[in-house]
Regions:
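Small-residue (G/A/S/T)-rich helix-start motifs and N-terminal tracts that mark the onset
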Residues: 1-86, 93, 198-274
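Nucleotide and nucleotide-moiety/phosphate-recognizing core
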Residues: 40-135, 143-165
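Short gly/ser/thr-rich secondary-structure transition/capping motifs
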Residues: 110-117, 145, 169-173, 236-242
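Internal gly/pro-rich beta-alpha loop/helix module
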Residues: 122, 129-130, 135-227
Length: 274
């Protein structure tokens, strides 16, 4: 029985880099696959994309790059998309910059957020069917600050359904701690392996339903990871439990030893035995 590995952000980064550098999958392609997986999750939950009103909020890093792909693919599938950047275009680099360019070329309206431009975001969020959170990602350390914190407030206050890309913004992937403001998602789509922050509170509560997808990370890179934990899910638990016939009783399936209580504190032991 192979239990699902649970990793931290550094380990996931190493898997990503080995997939790119050793096994020849371009980072741009991984980003495309990640964005496509999110769009497929949206289509499955909303029974199609045409006419769906979606706000996509992106940061400057790779998490934002996934978000640019989401926005472009939604637009190409007849959704109504508003894309908001929590940074200046010039601050976006690498593969993310390439995808931002492609998204703008495809005709997606893109707005840079500043302290004086939140009115457009507020209006779009209130009117949309879904918000896609691609703001901070798994590299977050510490509390979201400045414009990111303001955006998170707007997302949460809107009351609209949220789908988080990889992890809700504000949740630390290595611990599940939320040191400041954090997005409260209905669904989180994550890639390759679950992270610690998906499974430990309060981060777990921010994730909503966790949707794990394979975007083609190299198998040797995944296999070589020494996880910080393994996930014992329902299927794994069921495989560990012996099959019992319908007429079993306490005398036919072994005995239970109770180790509990102390002198003068036997109440819990008595209740357990009963």
């Amino acid at each position: 029985m192979e239990l699902v590995k649970v990793v931290n952000s550094r380990q996931m980064y190493e898997v990503d880099q080995r997939t790119i550098c050793e096994f020849g999958t371009a980072g741009r392609e991984l980003m495309e696959r990640a964005g496509r997986a999110v769009v497929e999750a949206i289509a499955a939950r909303w029974d199609g994309l045409a006419g769906l009103r979606v706000v996509v909020v992106c940061g400057k890093g790779n998490n934002g790059g996934d978000g640019y792909v989401v926005a472009r693919l939604l637009h190409q599938n007849a959704a109504q998309v508003d894309l908001f950047l929590a940074t200046e275009r010039a601050a976006v680099g690498g593969d993310a910059a390439d995808h931002l360019f492609d998204t703008e070329q495809a005709g997606v309206p893109v707005s840079e957020l500043s302290d004086c431009s939140f009115e457009a975001l507020d209006r779009s969020v209130v009117e949309c069917d879904l918000v896609v959170d691609a703001l901070l990602g798994i590299g977050l350390r510490g509390a979201p600050r400045d414009i990111a914190a303001l955006i998170i407030d707007r997302i949460n206050d809107s009351g609209r359904p949220v789908m988080a890309v990889d992890i809700p913004s504000g949740v630390e992937a290595d611990t599940g701690v939320t040191p400041g403001k954090s997005v409260r998602a209905m669904v989180t789509v994550t890639f390759g392996l679950p992270k610690v922050g998906h499974l430990f509170f309060p981060g777990k509560a921010c994730c909503g339903a966790l949707h794990l997808v394979d975007i083609g990370f190299a198998e040797p890179a995944l296999e070589d990871v020494q996880p910080v934990a393994r996930l014992l899910d329902r299927d794994a638990m069921n495989s560990l439990l012996p099959r019992r016939s319908g007429d079993v009783h306490k005398g036919s399936c072994g005995t239970v030893a109770v180790v509990a209580g102390s002198v003068g504190m036997t109440g819990a032991a008595a209740l357990t035995a009963e």
